[in-house]
Structure formats: C-alpha cells, structure tokens
Amino acid sequence: MVKEGKAMEIKEAFDLSQKAHQNHAKLVSSLRAAYNKTEDKSIFLEEFIHFLKFPLIVYRREPAVERVMDFVAKFVTSFHNSGGENEEEADEENSPVNCLFNFLLQSHGASSMAVRFRVCQLINKLLVNLPENAQIDDDLFDKIHDAMLIRLKDRVPNVRIQAVLALARLQDPSDPDCPVSNAYVHLLENDSNPEVRRAVLTCIAPSAKSLPKIVGRTMDVKEPVRKLAYQVLSEKVHIRALTIAQRVKLLQQGLNDRSAAVKDVIQKKLIQAWLQYSEGDVLDLLHRLDVENSPEVSLSALNALFSVSPVGELVQNCKNLDERKLIPVETLTPENVLYWRALCEHLKSKGDEGEAALENILPEPAVYARYLSSYLQTLPVLSEDQRADMTKIEDLMTKEFIGQQLILTIGCLDTSEEGGRKRLLAVLQEILVMQNTPTSLISSLAELLLFVLKDDDKRIQTVAEIISELREPIVTVDNPKDAAQSRKLQLKLADVKVQLIEAKQALEDSLTNEDYSRASELKEKVKELESLKTQLIKEAEEPEMKEIRVEKNDPETLLKCLIMCNELLKHLSLSKGLGGTLNEICESLILPGITNVHPSVRNMAVLCIGCCALQNKDFARQHLPLLLQILQLDEVKVKNSALNAVFDMLLLFGMDILKSKPTNPDDSQCKAQENADEDISEQEKPGSVDENLTNEEVQEETATVNGILHLFSGFLDSEIAEIRTETAEGLVKLMFSGRLISAKLLSRLILLWYNPVTEEDTKLRHCLGVFFPIFAYSCRSNQECFAEAFLPTLQTLFNAPASSPLADVDVANVAELLVDLTRPSGLNPQNKQSQDYQAAMVHDGLAIKICNEILKDPTAPDVRIYAKALCSLELSRENSTDLLPLLDCAVEDVTDKVCERAIEKVRSQLRSGREEHRVSKETEPQVSKETEDRTNLQENEEGKQKDEANCDENTDTVKEKAARGKATKGRRKGPAAAATRRKASKAEEAEAEMERQEESQCVPVNTRPSRRAKTAALEKTKKNLSKLLNEEAN
C-alpha cells in the first residue's frame, strides 16, 4: 500500500496500478511527489518509459494491462490538470506529456501489432484525459494527426479502432475538407470490419457531409452497426437536420427491421427523441413526417408510441374531441384524424380494457355515420378549369385523405347493435351512390360495407343495387307535348276567355240595373273563370317533366362500379360460384370494360375477370385466351394484372384449364407437368394421355401448354422490371405448389437470379433467394429437378458471348449453389424416411452426368468447374458401380493436372469407401460365428442357474449392439467426397467387381454395421465373458 509522506518508486507504482482495488489518484499523487523530488527529470522519464514498454507488448485485453494504461494516462495528463508552474512545464519539450507522446509516435509503426494497438490506445487515453481547454504544440498535434491517419489503414482491425478513437478530438466538422472527417467517412462506407464501423459511428461528428453516411449505416448488414447508427441519430442529430424523406425512410426501415434490438432502439430512443424535439406534441411530430404521403409509416410510429404508454393516459391525451366524441369538421386535419384512427385501432386491439376505453373516444355507429356523411357531402367536384390549379388539387387531396381515415375508423365501431348497424349500412350505401364521392374512397367504402354484411347473397344483392343506382340514376327530363293536345288546350283557353268577357259584361249590366243578387252570382263566376284561365296559361307555358333512368358510361362511373365489383368478388368464398346476378354484371359491365379506352378502367376490368375466373372453372377456360391477348398488347399496369390473373387460375385449377375439353383433373395435372418439361416431340406419347383423346387433340393441347410456357419464358427476358418480377414470382408459385415441374424454367430462374441486369430488382432477387432452398430441400424430386438443370445452366453460362451480361457471372459460384441445393444431407428430415429417399441419391446421378460431360471434351477449360463440383458431391459408396469406370476414363483423358488431381481424389475416396463396405460384409458372418461359439462354451462351463442367466444377458447384449449397428448402416454424417483417394488400375477394378458379384450371391442384402462398430461390440463381449469365466473358476 502507499505510505503517506514517502515517495514511491516507479516500478512499485506500476505494480500497484495493476490491482483492481487500487486508488489511482493516490498513486498519481505519490508518483508526482517522486517526480518533483527528482533533480534530473529526464532520468525519471526514461525509467518511466522503460517500465511502460512491458505492458505495451501485451495484445490481449488483460484487465491488469488495461488498468496500467489508465494509470499512465492519468499520471501524464495530471501535469496538464494542475496550475501554475506545472502548466509552464507542460509546455516545455521535455515535459512528461510531450516526452510520452514523442515516444509513442516513434513506436506507432512497430512490426508488432500488440505495440501498435497499445500505442494507439494510449494516445487515445491521453487525449481523452486532457482537459477541454488543453493546448498542444502545433508540431505535436500534426504528428499525432498524421500518425493516427496512417494507423487508420492498419491491417489489424483493433489497431484501426483505437486510431479512430484517438482521432475523435482532432476532427473539425465545420471544415468540409477535414482529413479526419474524410477518413471517418471512408471507413464508414468501406471498412470490412463491423467493429471499426461502430467505432467510427461513436466518434464521428454529424455534419452536412457525414450525416448521409450515418443515415446509410442504418442499412448495414450487421445488427450492432444498425443499432448504433439509430442511437447516434437519436442522441446527436436534431429532427430538423433530416429531410422528410430521410425521416420516413429511417422509421420505415427501423420498424420493419428483422432485429428486435433495432426495433427497440427505434421505439424507445429515436421516436422518443423526435417527440422531445417536437416539445411533446404528437401532432407536430406527425406533421414533420408528412402523413398524407406516408400514412403507414406514421401509423407504425404512433403504434410504437402507444405501446409504451398506459391506456388511461392515452385516452386523457386525446383532447381534440368535442362533447359528441367527434372532431369538429372545421378542425379536421390529416394529423389529428390519423392520430384518432390509430388510437382507436390500438385500443381495439387491447381486448376488454381497450374496448371500455374506446367508448370514451368513439360515438355510436348511427352518430358517426351521420358525421361521416355530412363531411363527405362537402367534398367539392372540380371543374376542368379548377383541375389546372394545383392549389385546388392539393386541397381536394387533403380532404380525400381525411375522408379516407374517417372511413377506415368505421372498423373500430361496435356494430353488434342492430339499429346502429342498419343505419350505418344505409349511410354507406348513400355515400357510394353520391356523385361527388371520390373514386379513391370507393374501395375502402365497399370493403367496410362488405365487412358489415356477412351473408354472401346479401352482399351480392346490395352491391348490385348500388351499381345499378350509380350507373343508371333517375333523371328528370322535359316531356315534349303533342301538337293536337296543345291545340286543344289553346281552344279551351280561348273559350274560357270568351266566357270571362261575357260574365264581366253581365256583371256590369246587373250592377247598372241594381240587380245585386245576380251581380253576386256573376262575381263568383268571374273568379272561377279567372282561376281556370291562370291554370290553363300555366299548363300551356310549363313543359311536362318526366323521370327516367339514364345509363352513364363515363370513365369515372365505370371505374367506381368496377371497383365495387372487384371488392365484392374478393370477399366472396370460392365455393360460391357465379350466379345470375354476377353473370349479368359480367356481361354488362366487366367485359365491355376490357375495350374501354381508359387504362384504369381496363385494368380494373381485368382484375374483375381474374376474380370471376376463380369462381368458375369454365369461365376461366373461356376467358383465358382474352387474358393472354391482353398480356401481349396492353400497357404495363394492365399486363401485370392480367399476368397475376393467369397465374391465379393456373394455381387454382392447374394446367387443366389449358385444355379445350374438361378431363380428369388428376390426369390433366400429370400431363401438364410432363408437357412443361419436354418439347412437343417428346410429349406425343400415346401412353401419357387419355385414351379417348385423338392425336390432333393431344398435339393441340401440348402446343397450347408449350406456347404459354414460351410466353412466360419470354417475359423473364422483358426489359420491364415489373413484368419480369411478376412472371418469376408466378412461376415460383406454380413450381412450389406442384402445378408445374420444369428443369428448363428452373434453369432460367437461376440465370435470372445471377443476371447482373436484375441487381437493382430487390423484390425479384429476394423472392428467388427464398424460393430456391425451400423448394430444393422440401422433397427429393425437387432436388432431382435442380440436378437436371445443372448442366444446362452451366452450359448457358459457358457459351454466353462477351457482350451478354451473363458473361460476368461467376460460374463456379453457380455450380457451388446447385451442388449445395442437391445435397441429400440438406433434405427435410421428415422426407428422409420416405421410400424415394432410400433410393439412389441425387448426387450419384449428377456425378455420372458430370463425368460424361468431362469425357465429351477433356481438354476444355470448363472441366475445372466440373471437377471442382465433382469433389463437392456427397456420393454413396453402395452405388459406385457405374461411376468408377467413368472416373477411370476421366483420369486418363484429362490433361489438366488440377482437374486430374481432383478427379483422382474422388475416385480414391470412392474406392476406399467401397472396400470398407466390402470388408464389413465379409467380417459380419465371422463375428456372428465367433460370438455363437463363445456363447456355447460359456453355457457348457457354467453350472449354476444364475451364471446361465448372466450369460444369456450378455449374449442378448451382443445381439442388440449388432442390431443397432445395422440400423445405423447407410446414414451419412456429412460430405465425404472431398477425402483423399488413391489411384487404382482397371485390373483391380475388375477384381473388385467380381468380388462384389460373389458377395451378392452368398451374403444377404440386409444392411450391416461398420467394421469398427462390430469390432468394438466383439471386444466388449470378450471382456464380459472373461469376467464371467474367471468368477466361475473361483
């Protein structure tokens, strides 16, 4: 321990600093006292550096060494931390700080990676322990700067990490040309070690130049790097420094990350930090995310916020609602309506507790229905002039977004009460029929209407009525009057006028004659005639109005009707079928929509035809040619829809719908699978089709199948990425479902996956990358399909011209993939017990194909790829009869030494394994005979019943071990094709063949244990029997 008032020696200080519970402050103080008492400071520093060299050569992160490094850094920097004379001394060239830095800078280029690592580590610790206001000589600063920049390029990752940490205080983020910042950016993008990238993320200062690189690390392949990148963004970067696109991208990627740790950082750090930057206002945060263009990302962010808050607190924070539990229409914004919807959906997912809380923020269905209807009625219908004004369009889009969110909130309402449900249905139907309802809202409205209606017949009837009302509304029109009727009315009016004149004249005469009773009667008559005259004049002037239904064929109306029809068909069960109503809709609405000039109408009509085809097989067969024609002629969007419709039909009904006449589904599926993999000439086999079909029908059907597959194959080469991706995805689904088995198409898909043209098509590559291993390892027949595609795929790559993108593909990598996909050891364990797995393995047949390909041209450069693939195969020693002669010929014919050695290794390993198998078969009868003799000897010598029982038990033990050995026969523990093989002559092969034939006659075909297992069992038996015999002798 340190004794007060007494200076310490340097060695003792280094020794004590290694201990875990030592107080480094006291050690520093004592060593400082010894330094101050030393007259010649240079001798002290030399001795100090001498003892420092010992921990510098230790590379492992030993705790004792780490403590020594900390102590050295604290001691040296203590000369900077003190004031007065020591500060002046610290500025001198021979000060401890400068002296140590100079020594470290001289040693940073040492050949020992331990020294380089510790030097960079100590420089880092020195710079970290220096105070904020510390000053370093410019020359020393430049030396440290240059040395650490050199160490950033060190071949050892740990050295680069320490150099990164050491340069953290030397960077200048305000300088766009700062060498440290540029080096950090370079390492962040290009360093292969994830720990180095993490170190850079820890140290780099965010700036206009480095921020995009930090954001880019959120897509790093390593989870710890992605996690740290999000942490840095949440702690060091203000939300305003990020663009809206960057914010949305960060949330979208982070909340959908495969790692739970990354999601946790997004939820608990990044979003919470952004919320603090928005002063706790969730609506302000949503405004910064642009909810109109990214509603799904905003919903995910809201759900992340809701998940860390109790239900009661969420309900209290919902302050935008009035006494009706509604947001006033005049205060509706995209942010508050989305927040309201997200909160309702979150509470509904919380079970009973959430349902109770939901009643506090949502009204009754009838009240909400009136509220929704009143808002949607305010949506304007823009005229042609207004459509040219972007402000008007943006305002309309905002209102449509609000309406969309209000519609989706209906799913959270409690529709169990009959009255509220009926009122809601009535309002939804009224909204769907309204002329000012935007097309963008029709799909959501129809989906919710069908969600409330549970019966399929009621759904069909309701949608049909809405379509009829929307397409044929009641219109009041002028009814032109008949000429004769109009003339009759004029005559009647003239007669009334004459009567009126006569009555007025008689009234005047009566008043003159003072006949007041007569005058009273005439006065009443004049009033009646005046009224009749007025009525006749009105009838003559006003046109007759009539209410009639007028069919509307404008694109907007047709699109609304088709959208509702499509939603209806999607919600119907496949067993429902097409009834009279749907057939009528199809004839009057869907099929005419195919020829419409507007692409959106045609696209929706194609989607409807695809849904109708899934309801009826005959309908699918009838309209398949129409869809195939659309595939080749229409626009990209319509093509995609038609393509998906065709694939859906093939998935549901199989290739049977390609036939002109219905046949047995099982037969049609089998024939379709055969046709998909063979040429027309190979398909014309009498035994592969139904006997009732004529040769002409067979040829027509096979031509149809091959024509469609040729069409799909052509789409795989399409320049349009969407068509290429949809085709590949559809073919993958057909193959995985067993509807289509084709090695040729499988080869095309493999080439498409490797083609550099598809490098940017993430969806396509992800789809194929998931499909290949799942399809290959699901069953043995699929592996056979890959084996059949092996040679065609490689030959296509070998023969690719230099101008083709396939010329840049690594053929060795393709061969390695195909070998790996056909490994028997990778097969699903559930299928390994099946009967077809017990047959000859896929690699045995593939090896024969490869050998034949090598023998075709042994001098070709492609032989190296084949030989390497041959070495990677898992070959069975039991089925090597056909393969060994081919290997012998290949060894003799191949001229390339590398290929010859590779083939020789395969042959040698195969022969040694076969010899082992033969010896084990010969040994088995001998072992059985020896075991039987020993058992008889034991029974003869034993005299007691107990010993006989023990002997029987040991005999049973031997049999059980032998049985277990037989059960394990044939199981392979891993690839054995790469073991060393020795060369053998053809005479030896012939002799081995004769021995094999003799064994097959006298030895049963039953599987046998290996020789080693049998010998071990025999040795155990010998020991047990000897023990028993000794006990008997005693």
From Swiss-Prot:
Protein keywords = Cell cycle, Cell division, Chromosome, Cytoplasm, DNA condensation, Mitosis, Nucleus, Phosphoprotein, Repeat
What does the PTM comment of the record read? Phosphorylated by cdk1. Its phosphorylation, as well as that of XCAP-D2 and XCAP-H subunits, activates the condensin complex and is required for chromosome condensation.
Q: Where in the cell is it found?
A: Nucleus; Cytoplasm; Chromosome
Q: Where are the HEAT repeats?
A: 95-132, 139-176, 178-213, 242-279, 281-317, 439-476, 618-655, 703-740, 785-823, 878-915
Q: Where is the composition biased (Basic and acidic residues)?
A: 909-949, 985-999
What Gene3D superfamilies does the record tag this protein with?
A: Leucine-rich Repeat Variant
> Which residue stretches does the UniProt record annotate as biased composition, category Basic residues?
964-984
SUPFAM superfamilies per record: ARM repeat
**InterPro entries of this UniProt entry?**
ARM-like, ARM-type_fold, CND3, Cnd3_C
| Superkingdom assignment | Eukaryota
What this protein is called in its record is Condensin complex subunit 3
Q: Which organism is it from?
A: Xenopus laevis (African clawed frog)
